């Protein structure tokens, strides 16, 4: 499994700015329209549509390759399932691998297998140029990540993947509660509590701080990232952009020059 592809998938998806963070500010109590009820109804309709689409995919997925026989979908042979997943991984048939990984995870009630299934669903998102149902695949990833953490609550990697998945789901459909909106940040903070130097958690918390205009917190996060990984020019450019947003041109130029210097050195 290409873990760098998973990481890239999550990072690229996280860059997309969303209006979901302003949703609750716009949904005031005096509004004449019950936006929460409307969004809940819309989300339920989307969920039903997603389930139907996924069920249809499962019906046809067995014919997507001749290397793995279609009867594997009804097999309970864990050794055969594991081998099939490995073959599908090699062939970059990530959706099929995700389905079988989820099946294997349910048979074994194994948190690692549930996490593998989630990763395959995320990898499928950016594997091909063909249009994908991003919401469907992200929700399937979330479903498996929730199961991973139910069985292994201290899995920090799964917490980070879940935080980003929930963030992206909130980007695609309005969250139904304040708790759902805040959960990505809470999950990331749980990771930082036990691993204060976790690069991914610090990075995502920094980006969330920028989106919510908490620039001082964002600076704190990215300066720590610089101290942990001083050779990564991206962190310097992030700091440059934050200072620019704050109107501090001098600091912005300083961090930009540092980033440019690192880029030239690497080349």
Segments the model singles out, each with a brief description of its role:
Residues 2-99, 107:
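N-terminal leader/linker segments that initiate helical-solenoid repeat arrays
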Residues 58-74, 88, 104-106, 118, ...:
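A conserved position within tetratricopeptide repeats
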Residues 75, 108-109, 153, 196, ...:
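Short coil turns that delineate tetratricopeptide repeat
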Residues 80, 113-114, 158, 201, ...:
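TPR alpha-solenoid repeat register
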Residues 88, 120-121, 166, 173, ...:
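Residue at a conserved register position within TPR or TPR-like alpha-solenoid repeats
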Residues 91-99, 128, 133-144, 172-190, ...:
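Structural signature of tandem alpha-helical TPR/SEL1-like repeats
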Residues 199-267:
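Extracytoplasmic/luminal low-complexity segments enriched in Pro/Gly and acidic/polar residues
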């Amino acid at each position: 499994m290409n873990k760098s592809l998973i990481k890239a998938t999550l990072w690229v998806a996280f860059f997309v700015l969303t209006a979901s963070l302003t949703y609750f500010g716009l949904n005031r109590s005096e509004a004449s329209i019950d936006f929460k009820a409307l969004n809940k109804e819309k989300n339920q309709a989307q969920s039903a549509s997603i389930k139907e689409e996924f069920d249809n995919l499962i019906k046809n997925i067995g014919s997507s390759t001749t290397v793995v026989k279609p009867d594997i979908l009804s097999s309970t042979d864990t050794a055969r399932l594991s081998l099939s997943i490995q073959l599908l991984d090699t062939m970059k048939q990530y959706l099929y691998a995700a389905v079988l990984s989820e099946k294997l995870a349910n048979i074994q009630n194994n948190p690692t297998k549930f996490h593998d299934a989630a990763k395959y669903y995320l990898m499928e998102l950016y594997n091909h140029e063909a249009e994908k149902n991003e919401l469907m695949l992200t929700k399937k990833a979330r479903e498996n990540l929730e199961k991973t953490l139910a069985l292994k609550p201290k899995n920090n990697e799964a917490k980070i993947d879940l935080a980003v998945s929930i963030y992206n789901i909130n980007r695609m459909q309005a969250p139904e509660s304040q708790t759902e909106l805040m959960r990505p940040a809470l999950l990331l903070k749980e990771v930082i509590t036990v691993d204060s130097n976790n690069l991914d958690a610090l990075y995502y918390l920094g980006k969330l701080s920028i989106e919510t205009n908490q620039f001082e917190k964002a600076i704190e996060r990215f300066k720590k990232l610089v101290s942990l990984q001083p050779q990564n020019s991206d962190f310097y450019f992030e700091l440059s952009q934050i200072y620019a947003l704050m109107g501090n041109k001098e600091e912005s130029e300083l961090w930009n020059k540092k980033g440019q210097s690192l880029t030239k050195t690497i080349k």
